[in-house]
Amino acid sequence: MHMNSYHIRVAGREDESFLREMLYESLYVPEGEEPFSRDILEEPFMKKYVENWGREGDLGYIAVNATGKPTGSITIRYFDEGNKGFGYVSDDIPELGMALLPESRGQGLGTALMKELFRGMKEQGIQKVSLSVAPENTAAMKLYERFGFQEVGMSGTSITMLADVI
């Protein structure tokens, strides 16, 4: 399926359950390994990425296919010193999260979502954005590097990356 059979829309409060679903999809599982239990979504360190979606500073987009099914998402949310995300850099830099359903990967959708998010962040005057990625997730790493993300540190086994928006 090509990009022209998709459209991208803003993520609203009513999308919280889909964003939770995407949070689960975003957990990187190396080839041949057991996927995480869905219970992980109830853990505070996961929940905080989408809980009460639509609060101040939240910005996100959802890709919807020709049949109206949401197939991917990209979000940013602010965290603070007392409640850090995995890709936390500072209170004034939002953290990006994105995921696509497996059948929607490798079709340019990640690039389209990223372009839309960067456009939205520029409009809001956001200057920098961070994220956390598993180093083995080479497809994601390549996409992030194309958008100017650079490694700034490690958090556990994941790489923290930072990009200039403006």
Task: Indicate residue ranges for each PLM-predicted region.
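Conserved N-terminal entry element of GNAT/NAT acetyltransferase domains
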Residues: M1-E14, I166
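Conserved GNAT-fold acetyl-CoA-binding loop/helix
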Residues: L27-V50
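A short helix-loop-beta-strand connector motif used in the catalytic cores of GNAT acetyltransferases and
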Residues: K47-I62
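Conserved beta-strand in the GNAT
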Residues: I62, K69-Y78
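A short, internal acetyl-CoA/4′-phosphopantetheine-binding micro-motif in the GNAT/acyltransferase core
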Residues: V64, E95-G106
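A short, polar/charged loop-to-alpha-helix boundary motif
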Residues: D80-V89
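C-terminal "cap" of GNAT-fold acetyltransferases
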Residues: S90-P94, Q127-M141, E145-I166
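Conserved acetyl-CoA-binding loop-helix of GNAT-fold acetyltransferases
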Residues: G106-R119, E123, K142-R146
